[in-house]
Structure formats: structure tokens, C-alpha cells
From Swiss-Prot:
Subunit structure: Part of the 50S ribosomal subunit; part of the 5S rRNA/L5/L18/L25 subcomplex. Contacts the 5S rRNA. Binds to the 5S rRNA independently of L5 and L18.
CDD domains named among the record's database cross-references: Ribosomal_L25_TL5_CTC (cd00495)
Keywords: Ribonucleoprotein, Ribosomal protein, RNA-binding, rRNA-binding
Upper classification of the organism: Bacteria, Bacillati, Bacillota, Bacilli, Bacillales
GO cellular component: cytosolic large ribosomal subunit
Domain of life: Bacteria
InterPro entries: Rbsml_bL25/Gln-tRNA_synth_N, Ribosomal_bL25/Gln-tRNA_synth, Ribosomal_bL25_b-dom, Ribosomal_bL25_C, Ribosomal_bL25_long, Ribosomal_L25_dom, Ribosomal_uL5_bac-type
Organism annotation: Oceanobacillus iheyensis (strain DSM 14371 / CIP 107618 / JCM 11309 / KCTC 3954 / HTE831)
Ranges of biased composition (kind: Acidic residues): 183-197, 206-215
Pfam families the record matches: Ribosomal_L25p, Ribosomal_TL5_C
Gene (UniProt): rplY
Family membership: Belongs to the bacterial ribosomal protein bL25 family. CTC subfamily.
Full protein name: Large ribosomal subunit protein bL25
Cysteine pairings via disulfide bonds: none
GO molecular function: 5S rRNA binding; structural constituent of ribosome
Ribosomal protein as UniProt keyword: yes
Length: 215
């Protein structure tokens, strides 16, 4: 079920008007989609953050614009890196009966056996691409890694799909692995490599020249 979010049309697109919108606690946004003319709106910043936090990044939002509503997903957003405030948002109009491709967060659950033995859990990807109808898009994909030993890994092919969606990534792609712990021997090797003096280019030739001159 889509969560409701109120929006207001934006007619004045000047910088000064946009600044006033942000000062009032709202976020300038654009609504667009396949065969849809873009519409400029604004939404309450707190309401948008709360919606994404409570419902997830891929939540279906019923955007209420005046006397009409449209089903959308938050496609992109911009944040002020200094003030940590929302600057802009993009909403993509979705067709509830059509499949779409979206990135879904991957969460590793549990402590691996390998970590208890000093191993290190590696997660090369934090999102994977899936295909599904809007209502079937999972909020996240949870992978139980508690049985992994040192040297074990989980690939896309190992993920149990619990729902009506398809994973589009290469089945052989690794999404989690446990690497061996770093040993003292590894550290000693690193120290030797770091302390080794670099070989001078041409040093061998210089020595050969000196020997020739001394003959």
C-alpha cells in the first residue's frame, strides 16, 4: 500500500523563490516519468525524511498534488554537505502493473564463524539490481552469514529469493566473504617491503661502466 505525501505545485522557478521554499522547511522537487511531462512541486522536508525512514528507500508514495494523486518513487535527491539538509528531490511516476529495475539494499545478518576465529567479513556490494512490479520490490535483501567460515563466500546464486522479484546481477558475483586474519608473518613481510630500499634505475649499467674503466 502506498504511503501518502502532500505536495504543492511550484509556479515560480526563480532562485529567490526556490530559496524561500527551502527556508520555509520545504524541498523543491520534480515529478516525471515515461510519457509524462515533468511537474515542479515542493514537499515538506520533515515529512519526506520520515516517509523514507519509515517506509524505505524504494517505498511507493502516493503523491497528493491539489485534487489529484500519482504513484511515485523517490528516484534521487541532493543534500547540502555542510548543513546536511535536503536541497532537491526527484520523484519517478510508476506504473503499478509494470515491472521496473531498481537497486535494493543488501544487509548481512549475524556474526560469522570466521569472524570468531579472527577472520574479516567483507561486503563488496551494498546494493543489488532487481526487477519487480512496484508493490513487489523488497525494502532490503537480508543475507544470513552466520555459518560462514574463513574462506567461505556467498554469491548472488546463493541468495534465497523470498518474494516476486528477480535478481539481475551475475549469479557468480560475490556479495559477502570471510577473509583470513592477518598474521604476524604477513605484518613482517609488509615491514620488509616498506623498509626495502628502491633499486636505482641504471645502477647496474653504472657498475658495468666502472668495471670497464678500471680494466
Amino acid at each position: 500500500m502506498a504511503v501518502k505525501l502532500n505536495a504543492t505545485k511550484r509556479e515560480d522557478l526563480t532562485k529567490s523563490a526556490t530559496k524561500q521554499i527551502r527556508l520555509s522547511g520545504r524541498v523543491p522537487a520534480v515529478v516525471y516519468g515515461k510519457a509524462k511531462d515533468p511537474k515542479n512541486v515542493s514537499v515538506d522536508s520533515v515529512d519526506l525524511v520520515k516517509t523514507v525512514r519509515d517506509e524505505g528507500r524504494n517505498a511507493i508514495i502516493s503523491l497528493q498534488v491539489e485534487n489529484s494523486s500519482v504513484d511515485v518513487m523517490l528516484h534521487d535527491y541532493q543534500i547540502d554537505p555542510i548543513k546536511d539538509e535536503l536541497l532537491h528531490a526527484d520523484f519517478y511516476v510508476v506504473n503499478m502493473s509494470e515491472e521496473m529495475d531498481v537497486n535494493v539494499a543488501v544487509r548481512l545478518d549475524g556474526e560469522t564463524k570466521g569472524e570468531k576465529e579472527g577472520g574479516v567479513l567483507q561486503q563488496p556490494f551494498y546494493e543489488i539490481l532487481v526487477r519487480a512490479k512496484p508493490n513487489n520490490i523488497p525494502e532490503e535483501i537480508v543475507i544470513d552469514v552466520s555459518d560462514l567460515d574463513v574462506g567461505d563466500s556467498v554469491s548472488v546464486a546463493d541468495i534465497k529469493v523470498d518474494g516476486n522479484y528477480e535478481i539481475l546481477e551475475d549469479p557468480d558475483t560475490s556479495v559477502a566473504s570471510v577473509t583470513p586474519p592477518t598474521t604476524e608473518e604477513d605484518l613482517d613481510t609488509d615491514d620488509v617491503d616498506e623498509n626495502a630500499e628502491p633499486e636505482l634505475v641504471g645502477a647496474e649499467n653504472d657498475s658495468a661502466d666502472e668495471e670497464s674503466e678500471n680494466k
